[in-house]
């Protein structure tokens, strides 16, 4: 009886220890498979447009989940020369740390598929942003960029050596007080060290078509529906 009691006590102690280890780890890591709408963690943008170069209206109906467990953002047209697009963003703000995503961008001229952090005047802060963007006109490349108090101009185009629109790959940036490092499938591709942003922001993913920025995105030809897919997101704090 004593042997059974000792074994049971040991087992319970082990389970409790494992629970607290996982809890402590979870305090530093946010990881989520994007297989369903978790309203406690995420929001769907709905019913408004960013204006300026964004030629679409964010719609909750353009944020969906596939049967095989992927987030699917869509660009659609409800009427002639009217477009709806999809954006998914975290409810919480996140600061310095490693941000990772497994995604497959849409391919078409005049569009952008993205993964980024953002905060700005609408959130009561300065405009700070860190970007991973795919310009649909050439998905064999990825663009990295960032803004600090609204100052950007740090675009860096990287040749991937593959077409990102055909399969899922992992893209990441490590944001620290003195630098930002961007990675593709775990390989360092670019480092920035000047005027690094500091304000925590929301984790965001979106798909949209542009207007008035043909020199950057190419001219959007009205093709729809178009889709960008996301498998999972992970954030590891300092």
Curated annotation (Swiss-Prot):
Enzyme class, UniProt record, top EC level: hydrolase
Signal peptide: 1-26
BP GO annotations: carbohydrate metabolic process
GO molecular function, one term: licheninase activity
Organism superkingdom: Bacteria
Domain GH16: 29-238
Entry keywords, A to Z: Disulfide bond, Glycosidase, Hydrolase, Signal
PANTHER family to which the protein is assigned, alphabetical: XYLOGLUCAN ENDOTRANSGLUCOSYLASE/HYDROLASE PROTEIN 8-RELATED (PTHR31062)
Protein name per Swiss-Prot or TrEMBL: Beta-glucanase
Species: Paenibacillus polymyxa (Bacillus polymyxa)
Gene: gluB
């Amino acid at each position: 009886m004593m042997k059974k009691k000792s074994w049971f006590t040991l087992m319970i102690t082990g389970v409790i220890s494992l629970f607290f280890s996982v809890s402590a780890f979870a305090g530093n890591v946010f990881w989520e498979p994007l297989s369903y709408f978790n309203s406690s963690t995420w929001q769907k943008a709905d019913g408004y447009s960013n204006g300026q170069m964004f030629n679409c209206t964010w719609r909750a109906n353009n944020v969906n989940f596939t049967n095989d467990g992927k987030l699917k953002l869509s660009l659609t047209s409800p009427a002639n020369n009217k477009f709806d697009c999809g954006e998914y963003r975290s409810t919480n703000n996140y600061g310095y740390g490693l941000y990772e995503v497994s995604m497959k961008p849409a391919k078409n001229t005049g569009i952008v598929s993205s993964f980024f952090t953002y905060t700005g005047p609408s959130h009561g802060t300065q405009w700070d942003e860190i970007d991973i963007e795919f310009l649909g006109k050439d998905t064999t490349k990825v663009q990295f960029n960032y803004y600090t108090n609204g100052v950007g101009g740090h675009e860096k185009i990287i040749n991937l050596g593959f077409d990102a629109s055909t399969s899922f790959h992992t893209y990441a940036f490590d944001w620290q007080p003195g630098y930002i490092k961007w990675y593709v499938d775990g390989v360092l591709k670019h480092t920035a060290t000047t005027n690094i942003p500091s304000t925590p922001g929301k984790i965001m993913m979106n798909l949209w078509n542009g207007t008035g920025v043909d020199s950057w995105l190419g001219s959007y030809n009205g093709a729809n529906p178009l889709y960008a897919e996301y498998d999972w997101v992970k954030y590891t704090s300092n």
